[in-house]
Amino acid sequence: MLSTHLLFLATTLLTSLFHPIAAHVAKRSGSLQQITDFGDNPTGVGMYIYVPNNLASNPGIVVAIHYCTGTGPGYYSNSPYATLSEQYGFIVIYPSSPYSGGCWDVSSQATLTHNGGGNSNSIANMVTWTISEYGADSKKVYVTGSSSGAMMTNVMAATYPELFAAGTVYSGVSAGCFYSDTNQVDGWNSTCAQGDVITTPEHWASIAEAMYPGYSGSRPKMQIYHGSVDTTLYPQNYYETCKQWAGVFGYDYSAPESTEANTPQTNYETTIWGDNLQGIFATGVGHTVPIHGDKDMEWFGFA
């Protein structure tokens, strides 16, 4: 069971909220649609979809997951993905949390299990519906998110690795770090948030791999962003998340291939462990790191 792999994780009710993303977003030519009949939706997650006027044949898909206090329509308005979809022709799915605080369930056994009936299951069903409905390319499906949505991005990559080719994580925590030993849904974990859950790459990898027992196929490449002065999800969570994916991909966490200063911009440092993992640490940046849409397009292979 997943719970046997986890360390000293404490859960409490949500006591603080994440800050929304501020972004300049250009006008889009399409419109956001709500979809209510995408299939099994065990936790009542809302689905919103943006289909660009410039839709490619066999288009790609980007799943863009909002922060706490947010909604799918809010993330549509305050992130660049719909605008970028008009340029590159992909579809954007904006899941919307069913909970009053707008956070995602990244704590219950259900959401941390493949086909377990949690939020992750609902989002996965949105992806498969969109592939079928629009003839999308199942090999060009990507996931990204900010804050609570970044946590869910890691969870989606662990629970449904077969669905995604790549992910970008803006200020999140490792998959399983918010696990609730009381099976609390949408629980807040102060121990994890404060960066006090520290373990080895191998242990983190075992936590992620336990979310889909027996899976041996490909996994999405991951790009991890975090700010050095984040006081909501402390910077140690950056290192633990990079450890997790280094362990999953079999990289030596202690010996990255390269480290590039002032990349992709001044005061950002990019660490590359291999083709499947990059970490980007933003000095002087709090919660959350702003979305780098153009860089996401490069990571996803659109640009």
UniProtKB/Swiss-Prot annotation:
The role this protein plays is: Acetylxylan esterase involved in the hydrolysis of xylan, a major structural heterogeneous polysaccharide found in plant biomass representing the second most abundant polysaccharide in the biosphere, after cellulose. Degrades acetylated xylans by cleaving acetyl side groups from the hetero-xylan backbone.
Q: Catalyses which reaction? A: Deacetylation of xylans and xylo-oligosaccharides
Q: Which gene encodes it?
A: axeA
Q: Thermal profile, per the record?
A: Thermal stability decreased at temperatures above 40 degrees Celsius.
Biological or metabolic pathway of the protein? Glycan degradation; xylan degradation
Q: How is it modified after translation?
A: Glycosylated.
Name of this chain's protein: Acetylxylan esterase A
**Organism this protein belongs to:** Aspergillus ficuum
> What GO terms are given for molecular function?
acetylxylan esterase activity
Q: Which UniProt keywords apply?
A: Carbohydrate metabolism, Cellulose degradation, Glycoprotein, Hydrolase, Polysaccharide degradation, Secreted, Serine esterase, Signal
E.C. number: 3.1.1.72
Q: Name one GO cellular component term.
A: extracellular region
Traced from the root, the source organism's taxonomic lineage reads:
Eukaryota, Fungi, Dikarya, Ascomycota, Pezizomycotina
- Signal peptide range in chain numbering: 1-23
GO terms under biological process: cellulose catabolic process; xylan catabolic process
Q: How does it assemble?
A: Monomer.
- Name its cellular compartments: Secreted
The answer to whether UniProt assigns keyword Glycoprotein to this entry is yes
